Amino acid sequence: MKYHLYDENYNHKGDFQSLQEMRNYLCEWKYDNDDRTYMHDTFDYIKSIRWHWDITE
């Protein structure tokens, strides 16, 4: 499966081969943007920043 990540304006942010890759990208994004909120669940965090994701096989 491939995970696709989009920001709040549906601009494509990246494609990831695994959920862990997508989570790592989000962790780097949080660090770069000085976001100090806790990310317990990847999908809840994506929702909290108003981003979107999709999966293709």
Task: Tell where the protein language model's regions lie, with residue ranges.
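Short aromatic-glycine-(Arg/Gly/Cys) micro-motifs in beta-strand/loop hairpins
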Residues: M1-Y10, E21, W29-Y31
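Short, mixed-charge low-complexity intrinsically disordered segments
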Residues: W29-E57
